[in-house]
């Protein structure tokens, strides 16, 4: 049933794009697709697996200059700055958002789930279980690098929330 639901959703999205391409608005449009990383598929992947958070961001539409694949790390909150930058609009008020298409931006992904956080860069992937106080995943050529960075980032998030 789950795979049928995925296939049906995919077919609906494809139909939508195919039909939209026929409209005059297509040439000035960008459609953004971001799948839900908690869709629990494949079934063996849990909240403490880095694979659960490797999700694509797809931008399609007539306003997209050329088809290409850009392999960078980012988080859902980076979508705001990325889209606004493409429209040449300011995004300073989104303090935790970065333009994923800007080569000068730091390319990392940060995610949280209840009692854990993760930080992923090209050279280190770490997941820390806050409740147990243990590192669950520490992979890559720079093992240990992202743990203090992730803790600092999480504290910065908490500080920002406390100010609001």
Please tell me what each predicted stretch does.
Residues 1-164:
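Solvent-exposed soluble domains appended to multi-pass membrane proteins
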């Amino acid at each position: 049933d789950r795979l049928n639901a995925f296939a049906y959703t995919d077919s609906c999205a494809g139909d939508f794009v195919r039909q939209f391409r026929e409209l005059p608005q297509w040439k000035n449009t960008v459609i953004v697709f971001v799948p839900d990383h908690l869709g629990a598929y494949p079934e063996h992947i849990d909240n403490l697996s880095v694979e659960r958070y490797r999700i694509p961001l797809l931008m399609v539409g007539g306003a997209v200059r050329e088809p290409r694949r850009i392999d960078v790390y980012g988080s859902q909150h980076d979508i705001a700055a990325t889209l606004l930058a493409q429209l040449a609009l300011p995004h300073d008020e989104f303090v935790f958002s970065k333009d994923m298409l800007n080569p000068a931006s730091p390319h990392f992904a940060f995610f949280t789930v209840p009692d854990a956080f993760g930080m992923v860069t090209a050279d280190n992937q770490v997941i820390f279980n806050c409740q147990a106080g243990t590192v669950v995943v520490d992979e890559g050529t720079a093992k240990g690098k992202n743990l203090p960075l992730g803790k600092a980032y999480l504290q910065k998030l908490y500080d920002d929330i406390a100010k609001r």
